[in-house]
């Protein structure tokens, strides 16, 4: 019985990155032997055990055989006869197929160390193409290690392109697809994840709403990058540089989906694209089982980002309506999220990457002033029922008007 540290822990150690989780592989043992040693079995599809003291996972060495469609269509075979190399052969990338024994020696039958040094993401074997989830995993690794200079090996990209043309991707469950998206949104370069998927053809299959943005032009005056898909990737990158909130990053990703619905004869203009995108966002979120928190913010950003950009031109009454619609009174953190997404939208354009966004300070000041209206004092003054709401609303409009009057660059005009 031999125990090896495998997978991400070995890879990250070689990259001098923090090690989060440790996974172990056991060669030459039976489930009965593991149980006798005090390990607790938790794996249903294949033998995985928890260490009696550390609770870390120990999996028996196994092989896999493709028996059906999708990432779950595998038959696993675990036996004391399965060798270290046979187990490593079933793994996705060479950089994830390195093992370390208890003496600290590295076992690298598929040259993963050389690929780490060459910064290459390369598949271990042709069996890579049997698991469609690996297309998403490689895209995620490309995004995760983009800052370290990693690139996908040409032969691996060719395999991913072939896989994207088969029915395998459509066999992925929405939950597994979203799981990979969510992990990527939490990484340093989520835009790379989607760029890789587009490069291999998977974006069109899994995220047709996003893929449809590429090739849609925008006015060059405001968008020197012109292409809406390119702009979307730039906005996602900007949002990632400003916040780690995945909900904000998701909102940045989908804020312009409505532009794909603009009639070609109207290009490069996209009137009402924010509102046109709302049903598209709802449909995407429903299909992928996107959390409500992400969906609600994405809908708000799509619906209101044009108003936020034009904040200085809005009447005080319109600003209060925006605050009401977004329910900032009960969820003030949403204003910060909306503004972050709008800043990313403004800076996600060629030549505008470091542009100031005074609308943010202005709307924050408007909200702070409006939120200071004392509702309890209005109730104490004897107002009742619908009167309370009317008076509160009127007072809030007055407070915003005062901010507007003294704010440089804000138009004082209050008539429609």
Curated annotation (Swiss-Prot):
InterPro entries: CCA_bact (IPR012006), HD/PDEase_dom (IPR003607), HD_domain (IPR006674), NT_sf (IPR043519), PolA_pol_head_dom (IPR002646), PolyA_RNA-bd (IPR032828), tRNA_CCA-adding_enzyme (IPR050124). Its cofactor is Mg(2+); Ni(2+). Magnesium is required for nucleotidyltransferase activity. It catalyses: a tRNA precursor + 2 CTP + ATP = a tRNA with a 3' CCA end + 3 diphosphate; a tRNA with a 3' CCA end + 2 CTP + ATP = a tRNA with a 3' CCACCA end + 3 diphosphate. The keyword Magnesium applies. Its EC number is 2.7.7.72, 3.1.3.-, 3.1.4.-. CDD domains: HDc, NT_ClassII-CCAase. Gene3D superfamilies: Beta Polymerase, domain 2, cca-adding enzyme, domain 2. Mg(2+) binds at residues 21, 23. One of its GO terms (biological process) is tRNA 3'-terminal CCA addition. Keywords: ATP-binding, Hydrolase, Magnesium, Metal-binding, Multifunctional enzyme, Nickel, Nucleotide-binding, Nucleotidyltransferase, RNA repair, RNA-binding, Transferase, tRNA processing. Residues 228-329 form the HD domain. GO terms for molecular function: ATP binding; CCA tRNA nucleotidyltransferase activity; cyclic-nucleotide phosphodiesterase activity; magnesium ion binding; phosphatase activity; tRNA binding. ATP binds at residues 8, 11, 91, 137, 140. CTP binds at residues 8, 11, 91, 137, 140. Disulfide bonds: none annotated. Catalyzes the addition and repair of the essential 3'-terminal CCA sequence in tRNAs without using a nucleic acid template. Adds these three nucleotides in the order of C, C, and A to the tRNA nucleotide-73, using CTP and ATP as substrates and producing inorganic pyrophosphate. tRNA 3'-terminal CCA addition is required both for tRNA processing and repair. Also involved in tRNA surveillance by mediating tandem CCA addition to generate a CCACCA at the 3' terminus of unstable tRNAs. While stable tRNAs receive only 3'-terminal CCA, unstable tRNAs are marked with CCACCA and rapidly degraded. Monomer. Can also form homodimers and oligomers. Comprises two domains: an N-terminal domain containing the nucleotidyltransferase activity and a C-terminal HD domain associated with both phosphodiesterase and phosphatase activities. Belongs to the tRNA nucleotidyltransferase/poly(A) polymerase family. Bacterial CCA-adding enzyme type 1 subfamily. A single active site specifically recognizes both ATP and CTP and is responsible for their addition. This is Multifunctional CCA protein. It comes from Shewanella sp. (strain MR-4). The gene is cca.
